[in-house]
């Protein structure tokens, strides 16, 4: 059996159940070392491998999820697969569940989406949340949070999709770690840094 552990949003978010699963694992594999929550793995001092190289070898985001799932599945029983945020929200975990026909154990963690929604100020209201990797596949509405904005190119793709719906002059919040900055949408791909913790929120819908 393969176990999936959600590492949460930052160091210190790992649950005790997740911690014990990692410590008892025959092998530990981590989706990415670029997320802040990766510190929860390094703090345990266990041997592990990271799958960041698969990002570069994947031709599309759909291929990425399948390639990650394939790599984890091939490691076999006794493997613990660690992802940032809540494991149930991760698209590679969904692909792994399909590949394994549901024969995985999921230990959830602190939700990346919930943390971003709080920073965006959407608590207490209805909102839409979507990964930047799947944004082109859904019907957009606001309030909206788009997460997983891992690099400048992806931020540019997000900008174009949101501009088609809301207009490039629309004010949005650029979120990255503790930073929450209001910017016009057309500046989304001009920020200093990006990463697994980077996101953008649109507060209200102004249809073109």
What are these model-derived regions, one by one?
Residues 1-107, 188-191, 198-199:
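Class I S-adenosyl-L-methionine
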Residues 2-5, 102-208:
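Beta-strand/loop-alpha-helix module characteristic of Rossmann-like adenine-cofactor folds
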């Amino acid at each position: 059996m393969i176990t999936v552990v959600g590492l949460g949003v930052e160091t210190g978010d790992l649950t005790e159940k997740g911690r014990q699963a990692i410590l008892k694992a025959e092998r530990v594999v981590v989706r990415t070392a670029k997320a802040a929550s990766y510190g929860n793995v390094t703090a345990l001092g266990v041997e592990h491998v990271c799958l960041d190289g698969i990002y570069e070898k994947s031709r599309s985001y759909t291929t990425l999820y399948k390639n990650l799932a394939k790599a984890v599945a091939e490691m076999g029983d006794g493997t613990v697969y660690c992802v940032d945020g809540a494991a149930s929200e991760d698209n590679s975990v969904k692909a792994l569940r399909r590949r394994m026909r549901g024969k995985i154990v999921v230990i959830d963690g602190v939700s990346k989406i919930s943390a971003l929604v709080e920073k965006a100020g959407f608590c207490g209201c209805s909102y839409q949340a979507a990964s930047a990797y799947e944004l082109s596949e859904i019907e957009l509405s606001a309030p909206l949070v788009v997460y997983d904005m891992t690099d400048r190119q992806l931020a540019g793709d997000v900008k174009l999709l949101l501009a088609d719906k809301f207009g490039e002059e629309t004010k949005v919040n650029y979120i990255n770690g503790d930073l929450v900055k209001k910017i016009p949408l057309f500046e989304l791909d001009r920020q200093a840094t990006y990463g697994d913790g980077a996101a953008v929120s649109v507060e209200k819908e102004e249809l073109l």
